[in-house]
Amino acid sequence: MALGWYELKLAKDGQFMFNLKAANSQVILTSELYRSRSAAENGIASVQKNGLDEKNFEVRVAKNDKPYFVLKAKNHQEIGRSQYYSSSVSAKKGIVSVTKNAASTVIKDLTNEA
């Protein structure tokens, strides 16, 4: 089975962020903003490590009543979060997708495309 990949990007304010994409190109996890490239790369490494275990995920419900999930490191710090889903079942399928794709070592550097 083909794995997804990470896309490292520059945000509009010059900070770094990344998305984890599934093999079908769908974004399945979005990071927080990082002040440096190395911090964002460390975030990717944390997803590669912590994203393999479903125990590190937490399903939440947004103010608009849409479920989403967050991935947390062992220190309980949030590493990334999902999009909003139509149901908790869909959010849980998203978690399974992250666990299947988190180990990817493919990082597409899009920081020069901003």
From Swiss-Prot:
Q: Which domain of life is it from?
A: Bacteria
**sequence repeats: from-to residues:** 11-59, 62-110
Q: What is this protein called?
A: UPF0339 protein PM0519
Ordered alphabetically, the record's keywords are: Repeat
UniProt record similarity statement: Belongs to the UPF0339 family. Duplicated subfamily.
Q: Which organism is it from?
A: Pasteurella multocida (strain Pm70)
